Each structure stands twice: as structure tokens, then as C-alpha cells.
Amino acid sequence: MLSCSSKDERGAKLYKVHCSSCHMLPDIQDLPKNLWEQSILPEMGARLGVQDSLFDPLKGHPYSEQYAIIKSGVYPIKSSIPKQNWKVLKDYILKLAPDSLPLSPMTKIDQFTNFNPKSVNIDSTNGAFISFLSYNKQNKRIFCGDINGNLVSYDHSTKEVKSLLQTKQAITDYSESTEGKIVTHVGYMNPSEIARGNIQIVNDSIKELPFTLHRPVANLVKDLNSDTIPEMVICEFGNLTGSLSLLSKRGTGGYEKTTLLNQPGATRVIARDMNGNGKDDLIVLMAQGDERVLIFEQNPNFTFNLRPVLQFNPLYGTSWFDLVDYDGDGDQDIITVHGDNADNTYIQKPYHGMRVYINEGNYKFSEKFFYPLNGATRFVAKDFDQDNDIDFAIISTFPDYERKPEFSFVYLENKNSEDFIFNTQISDISNLGRWLLIDSGDFDSDGDEDIVLGSFTYSFTPVPNNMLENWEQSNTDLLILENTLKP
């Protein structure tokens, strides 16, 4: 028989060994006991090869998906932990797990007056399923794609909606380069181990590249090695497996695919010279378990050195990041938001929100500010009021729609950059749509920065029936927030 103290010590050791091999070690206190027992432990057990009556990773999937799940190797047939140790580990976690989580602290809030909301309907149907959104500064148009494969552009000055493409798959990225118009299709929107995504290059005709991609959610098209030919860096988010991939054009005219990172969760990639050697490095956000920000340093021979710079708790639900010189010292700081809650641990989580990491040199970034916001998923960081500091506009796709739906969009007006003092402003625009995407730009050419929100009215998580009905009947696909700074 093990004593209580020795059993706890054994449990602590097992927790460190088995719960930090694939990602940062989470704090047991970060989830309530019922979610550990009903969701996390059964999933974790399956990944250790432990049979559990509460969870079968193959159940409910068609045979093709089952085959792909088995092929991934994520759920081994043979257990890697003895039954006695598994029981000790489970007992240890459930003993320490809290019954509930504390609520996020409330901050003083105001109604925002800096922006004037304007609804935009880009099609003839109610409801919205915008899967891609980006503002193009060169032609002053907003580009958006939906899950039905429709790509349109919108000119806010003339109110013109122009249909560009009609494809058959959900669009997750679009860009224009010397190669043509490049359209990225995700394949399966819902989590899947089956790769069905693709890239099409549109000129006079449509050419589909000969690569099947695993749920690509972003595609950076840029000439990285200064040979005048753009490369593509593709975030194949995947599911149980995935990758960060590089497509380079060969002398024969075709593309060659290289895997930069064999890991699921690639969400966004930015090209920026981070070490001052004149070459674009790749800064990448990884989600899906091992949540990190990575820098791929570009070498002279167009290879890359991997430098991990930030790692997050796997329960954070890391969703987005950007590089911003927040403190005005000439280098790039990292801003992140955490709040993806579309999984089997859905509760309001006090560690969701926005974090500011200041660049201290030599690839060291230190967290200096945290703004709590349940379900925070994306943001834009600009000087919206033109007072020489960085303000933030944040969307939450997973707010507490039952009690605080107005927190689906939050504007943080910077009052003191050094001390991180912000005026929190909200507006109840949640009835118009479920905000999934955000971008900004001077849409009306009046000299200030406006904001655009893209709606995706699918119900990922619990939402009041009256709000669902409003979304289904709404004709708001995009919501323009016109900055009122310049009349």
C-alpha cells in the first residue's frame, strides 16, 4: 500500500512526465474537476493507449476518417503507462482540480463613440459564413470569401460589391501576386484528419497546384529569397497532425513542397527581418496543443533555423498574434490573444484575453500586460485616435453570450503606454453577427483607420435562442466601424 504522501509524490512525478511531453505543463487548477474527469483525462488516456469507456477516438466517424485517425498514430494500441500508474495519475489530478474557476475581473467600461457601425450585405441571403477577410490598401477594397467558395470585393466608398470567383470549397486565404490570383481552400472546415485542401492560381484560366493540403488556414505569398519569384508559406492547421509548409518554384515552372515543421496548429505566419541581416524571417503562431510562437531565421542558402520564443499553456486557446512596435523603441514586440473555446472544455476561462510581450533583445520577449477577455480570438493594433500610441480592437468569438454578449467586441483606447493604462469601450453589436474575423484600413479615404468585422453565424458553443434567430435573420455579412476622428 502507498501512503497518501508517497502516492501524491508519485502522482506529481507522473503528471510532469506524461503531461509535458507534448506541450507546456498545464496547471491542474486551470480546469474544473468535471472537465478533467469527463473530457481531458479520457482524451489523454487514449493518447497514452489506455482504454477508457468514456472515450473512443473512432466513435461516430465514417470509416475514411477512422482510417486517417488510426494512420496518424496519435492513439496507440499498446498502452505506454501501466494501469496502476494511470489510476495514481488520475486520482492525483482529480484531487487537486477545483470545482469551478474564478470569474475574470471586471474593468471599468464605457460605450464607444469613436466608431460608427455600418452593416454590409454582400449577398442575397440572411446569415453569414465569412471564412476569409482582408483589406487591400493598394486598391482600397475589402476582400472576403465564404464557406461556399464565393470570393467578393467590397469598396466602402462606392458601396460596390464585386463577385470575383465562385469555387466549390471554403476559402481561407486570397492574395494577388505576379503569379496571379492565389486562392487557398481549406477542404474540411470541421476538424478532420483527411486532407482535402488545395491552392488555385487564377489568371485567364484556373490552375490547381498538385498538392493536397491538410486544412490550410493561411497562405503567405512573398518573395522571401529575393529572386523575384514569390514563395508560399502555408499553415496546414490540420487536426491531430498538420504542418507548416513551403512551396518554392522550380526551374521547370512547377512548385516543390518542403515541410518546415511537422506539427498541427499552424495558424498565422508573418515575414519580417527579426535579426537585421536583410533577410525575411518567418514568425509563426502554433496552436492545437503545443501553443507557441516560433521564429524561423533565414540563412543565406535559403534554409531556416528554428528559434522558439514563446510557449503557452495548452488550455489558453491561443488564436492570433501580430508584431507591433508597442513601446516605440524600434524593434518588434509580440501581441497575442487567447480564447479559442470551440472544444470539449467549454467554460468561461479567466486566462483568456490579450497579452503584450515586449522585445528585450536576443529573442527574449517578456509578458508585460494581460487584458482578460473571455473567448478572445483576433485583434488589430493601430493608432486609431492618432495620438502616437497603439490602441487595440479585439473580437471575441466565444464571449459569455448569456450574460455579457456586448463583450464580443472591445476597443482598448491607449491612455498611457508605459503603464499599460487603457480605456475599455464596448458597444452591443452582438445581435448583428458572430464576429470571427477582423481587419482595419482607411476604407473611406478620410485619413483615419476604420475597422471591418466578418460574421460567421455557426453556433460553435451555447448561444441564447433569440440571438441565434437574430443572426439567422440578419443580413449583416460585414460590419464596418467607421472611425469618426476625421469628419
Spans of model-derived segments:
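Beta-propeller-forming repeat regions
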Residues: 5-13, 17-487
